[in-house]
């Protein structure tokens, strides 16, 4: 698909720019870490990707193996969906989605409609067809508001760590690794994004210090310790007392 070619070229271009800043003297650590984390950033989870993952034949085969399902016996799989208004609006074309989310009233109204936990039996024909149709929107994905948001966020993150490469190489590497904090879908993604933003705010606070990279590593590890990020907040509080 044209969208896949576009994504591959975009990935290569972004990585080439980083490799040009890197060197053998540093064992290309920044480039290696960037290759992994930029790829993960481009494979963000939205409704289209979640639908794609849930309708793959390999997934059903894996579940059958894990459950020890006897051949010709059909296993029934129930999925839990909990989309927020943001996930739905994220599927809109960029211009329409941007217009829609500017109104808090529209967003609240939509959230009341969609933000309800739903259990869907994905092995039933109607549910499977719905998910399959959604998964087929992969080529449309690059036109959505969510794609534009993810693209801009990724660019900001890349520009952030690239700025530290000449003088604080190790800090740049640690900022690259912070991308692992962002994962999942819906509420899980929101929590991860919040931890990522707080960790990078801490990186900015310590950026002039010789031990800046160590501090960012500590912040990242603290962010992974609990769901809400309380350990991270504690580490940030410590930083503010020493700068």
Segments the model singles out, each with a brief description of its role:
Residues 2-6:
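Short, small-residue-biased leader/transition segments that mark boundaries at the very start
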Residues 7-26, 154-163:
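Short amphipathic alpha-helical segments and their helix-coil junctions
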Residues 20-34, 169-173:
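Structural motif
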Residues 26-31, 50, 211-212:
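Short, surface-exposed acidic
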Residues 44-46:
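Soluble, non-transmembrane catalytic domains of enzymes that act on hydrophobic metabolites at membranes
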Residues 51-243:
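C-terminal amphipathic alpha-helical interaction region
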